């Protein structure tokens, strides 16, 4: 997990958005299912994740999940570019670096009801 992921989670909490952290090892199908279930409007991802000496193409996996269909709620994808490789951007994609360029130093909080969900956490269940 990157510092930008922590920033994104905290920013969501600050402005009253529900977030869901998805394990980087999930398949496109698993991501598609979670996006559809949560009716996600925004996806924040990175071009790659490095785990166990391997480079995992997160942005490509997200693009594949969206291409499967059914993720009609998604309006934008924000991508953190961690490598110097070209990143495949779709028309509605935004680079993290472009997004934060002109942001203010402070952001007023958005107040929500006490019952408003802070996050959605998906677990893998083992059936015995």
Task: Enumerate the language-model features and the residues they cover.
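Conserved AMP-binding/adenylate-forming
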Residues: 1-32
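Short acidic/polar active-site loop segments enriched in Thr and Asp
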Residues: 18, 41, 75
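Conserved ATP-dependent adenylate/AMP-binding module captured primarily in the ANL superfamily
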Residues: 26-69
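Conserved residues at the C-terminal ends of beta-strands
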Residues: 46, 80-81
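Flexible, active-site-proximal loop/turn residues at the rims of small-molecule/cofactor binding pockets
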Residues: 49, 83-84, 105
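Short helix-terminating capping/connector loops at secondary-structure junctions
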Residues: 70-74
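Conserved pre-ATP/AMP-binding loop-to-beta segment of ANL
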Residues: 75-79, 88-122
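Conserved small/polar residues in nucleotide/adenosyl-binding loops
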Residues: 123-128
